[in-house]
Amino acid sequence: MKNKTKIIISGALGRMGKILIKETKKNKLIKLVYALINNNIDIKNHNQFYKVKEKKKFITLNNLKKKKKILKFDTIIDFSSPKYSIKIIKYCLKNNKKIVLGTTGFNTEQIKIINNASKKIPIIYSPNFSIGINIIYKILKNISKILGKNSDIEIIESHHRNKIDAPSGTALQLGKIISKSMKWNFKKSAIFSRYGNIGIRKKKRIGFSTIREGNTIGEHTVLFSNKYEKISIFHKAIHRSVFAKGALKAAIWISRKKNGLYNMSDMLKKIKI
């Protein structure tokens, strides 16, 4: 058996963190070293999810920083919040560790920090680690070039009621792929709000619609509509494990890479579409 990729999971008590920990048990190429939790979280409230053996791996970032012995791990997988993710990135910079970044909602300044960090450590960043949605990213490049000029383009996304950023990082990425393929300025093309007398639709526009309801994991639709036909590209995440499985594959992949900012498309380059 090959050497296992040793990981730390950040945001370990969140939705994705719990699933990631569960998926590490099934993956023979991954070894969980630690699971990061916030300082103000009481692990006792999560007893139903973890066995005693697992709970020994839980640690706060502050306590991780205090460890004098060099920790033998390869990569941190982070699904947390923008503010906490930046702390994780700074820790990885200081300790020369790789990072799989799945957090969304970063502002412009935080994106700059990520870009600068990638000059010194390997980072793979994706708003969506589903293999399926990343294949759609690849397909979308070609479809946009063929249909984009003469079509009205709309992106509709739906997520659970607790998601705090909108539109989703995946929806924004879909829009950016389309605008780049069409050589449009994304900031000018993106329409995030419609209300009142907005007039007729202008050319070179990408409309975004956001739905927040119930427990929806993630649904994304891209519409290309013209006077003759309508094409709809739809993706639905049925279980969050699809993101966890993709993130673990990314952790293995990034462990062999040099410094740089990567995405899932880089990882999937061998897939020809």
From Swiss-Prot:
- Its EC top class is oxidoreductase
The reaction(s) catalysed by this protein are: (S)-2,3,4,5-tetrahydrodipicolinate + NAD(+) + H2O = (2S,4S)-4-hydroxy-2,3,4,5-tetrahydrodipicolinate + NADH + H(+); (S)-2,3,4,5-tetrahydrodipicolinate + NADP(+) + H2O = (2S,4S)-4-hydroxy-2,3,4,5-tetrahydrodipicolinate + NADPH + H(+)
Residues that bind (S)-2,3,4,5-tetrahydrodipicolinate = H160, G169, T170
Asked if the record carries the keyword Cytoplasm, the reply is: yes
Q: Give EC number(s), comma-separated.
A: 1.17.1.8
**Entry annotation: catalytic residues:** H159 (proton donor/acceptor), K163 (proton donor)
Keywords, A to Z, come to:
Amino-acid biosynthesis, Cytoplasm, Diaminopimelate biosynthesis, Lysine biosynthesis, NAD, NADP, Oxidoreductase
Gene Ontology MF annotations: 4-hydroxy-tetrahydrodipicolinate reductase; NAD binding; NADP binding; oxidoreductase activity, acting on CH or CH2 groups, NAD or NADP as acceptor
Annotated pathway: Amino-acid biosynthesis; L-lysine biosynthesis via DAP pathway; (S)-tetrahydrodipicolinate from L-aspartate: step 4/4
Where, by residue number, does the polypeptide cross the bilayer?
none
Which CDD domains does the record associate with it? Answer: DHDPR_N
Q: Name one GO biological process term.
A: diaminopimelate biosynthetic process
Quick one: which residues bind NAD(+)? Answer: G11, A12, L13, G14, R15, M16, G102, T103, T104, S126, P127, N128, F129
InterPro entries reported for this sequence: DapB_C, DapB_N, DapB_N_CS, DHDPR_bac, NAD(P)-bd_dom_sf
Record has Metal-binding as a keyword: no
Provide the Gene Ontology terms for cellular component.
cytosol
Q: How does it assemble?
A: Homotetramer.
Function noted in UniProt: Catalyzes the conversion of 4-hydroxy-tetrahydrodipicolinate (HTPA) to tetrahydrodipicolinate.
Provide the family line: Belongs to the DapB family.
Q: Could you identify this protein by its name? A: 4-hydroxy-tetrahydrodipicolinate reductase
Which species is the source of this protein?
Buchnera aphidicola subsp. Cinara cedri (strain Cc)
